[in-house]
Amino acid sequence: MARFPEAEARIFKKYVCLRCGATNPWGAKKCRKCGYKRLRPKAKEPRGGGR
C-alpha cells in the first residue's frame, strides 16, 4: 500500500473493465476501449502472495 493518502488515491482510484482489462478513470460509466458497462474498482490488496 501507499505511504500517504495522495499517492494511494492516485494509484487505486481507478476502474478496471471486466471484459478487456483496461484501466478507466474513477468517474467512468463505461469502458474507454470497448464500451462495456461493467467496471470494477482496482484491487487495493495484492492477489498472488509472491510465490
UniProtKB/Swiss-Prot annotation:
Q: What's any GO biological process attached to this entry?
A: translation
Give a yes or no for keyword Ribosomal protein in this entry: yes
Mention any one GO cellular component term assigned to this protein in its UniProt record: ribonucleoprotein complex
Gene3D superfamilies referenced in this protein's UniProt entry, alphabetically: 4.10.1060.50
Return the HAMAP family for the record: Ribosomal_eL40 (MF_00788)
Listed PANTHER family: 50S RIBOSOMAL PROTEIN L40E, LARGE RIBOSOMAL SUBUNIT PROTEIN EL40
Q: What is this protein called?
A: Large ribosomal subunit protein eL40
Which source organism?
A: Pyrococcus furiosus (strain ATCC 43587 / DSM 3638 / JCM 8422 / Vc1)
